[in-house]
């Protein structure tokens, strides 16, 4: 299954299992921070939905505290739509190849002893490494309410597995693998890294899932310093015709020496760089 953003039983209730800590729900800054971090994390799960009990979970109910939490969740929501071509293609490969959407680092980096021990980072599809923020930074929950933290730490430690380089999704900064770094983690975002050698299909943020990869208006972001390729799965986005072969697989190939992206017919494809800066 998947996470239910918002959680169940967030308030104190009448039964032994109904023992939440956030009676004021969206009026409690500590709950706003918690919900925001959950929302940012769940952006990188197969199913993304605000579900739970005891309080409203629609984004427009989180505009308090100067709107910083609302803006952070809105940013995550837009990113989810921007990544739909990648997410949809990944889901297609789960059906077609028995691939997995989410994997622990040990699956892809079995020879990296440090990666075997990581339990708070994971791979989402073949290209993205997600690093959720699981510690409070801005508000600490106490018996008297939410205590605002002075000079909060806005970083978290991230391990970059060895065997490839990594790009910071937000800044395009390039890092060699096999090292720990302090990654920026302000309330606006969680650390997110792209594996070197990736071609990431994206689109403009949409109003609904009806405006997805089938629109054909894709942007390919190249994160590479050598030749690489990406196989994009598409179908009509509705019904079960794909089970009878009504789908398309298109391979996009990056030529590092020519700095050109081509499709499987040799046609040049418009792309943008996930530029490296050391």
Question: Over which residues does each language-model region extend?
Answer:
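Catalytic-domain carbohydrate-binding cleft regions of carbohydrate-active enzymes
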Residues: 1-189, 237-242
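Accessory, solvent-exposed terminal regions and/or long lumenal/extracellular loops of proteins
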Residues: 189-278
């Amino acid at each position: 299954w998947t996470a239910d953003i918002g959680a169940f039983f967030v308030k104190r209730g009448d039964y032994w299992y109904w023992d939440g800590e956030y009676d004021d729900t969206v009026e409690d800054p500590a709950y706003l921070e918690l919900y925001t971090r959950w929302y940012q994390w769940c952006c990188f799960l197969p199913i993304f939905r605000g579900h739970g009990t005891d309080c409203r979970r629609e984004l427009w109910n989180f505009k308090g505290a100067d709107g910083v939490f609302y803006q952070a969740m809105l940013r995550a929501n837009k990113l989810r739509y921007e990544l739909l071509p990648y997410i949809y293609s990944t889901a297609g490969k789960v059906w077609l190849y028995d691939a997995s959407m989410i994997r622990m680092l040990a699956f892809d980096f079995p020879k990296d002893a440090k990666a075997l021990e990581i339990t708070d980072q994971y791979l989402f599809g073949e290209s993205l490494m997600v690093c959720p923020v699981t510690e409070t930074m801005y508000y600490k929950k106490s018996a008297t309410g939410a205590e605002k933290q002075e000079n909060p730490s806005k970083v978290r430690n991230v391990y970059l597995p060895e065997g490839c380089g990594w790009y910071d999704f937000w800044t395009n900064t390039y890092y060699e693998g096999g090292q720990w770094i302090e990654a920026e983690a302000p309330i606006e975002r969680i650390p997110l890294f792209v594996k070197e050698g990736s071609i990431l299909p994206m689109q403009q943020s949409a109003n609904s899932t009806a405006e997805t990869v089938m629109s054909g208006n894709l942007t390919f972001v190249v994160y590479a310093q050598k030749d690489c390729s990406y196989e994009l799965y598409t179908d009509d986005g509705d019904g079960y015709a794909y089970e009878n072969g009504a789908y398309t697989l298109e391979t996009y190939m990056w030529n590092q020496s020519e700095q050109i992206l081509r499709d499987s017919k040799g046609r040049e494809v418009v792309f943008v760089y996930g530029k490296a800066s050391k």
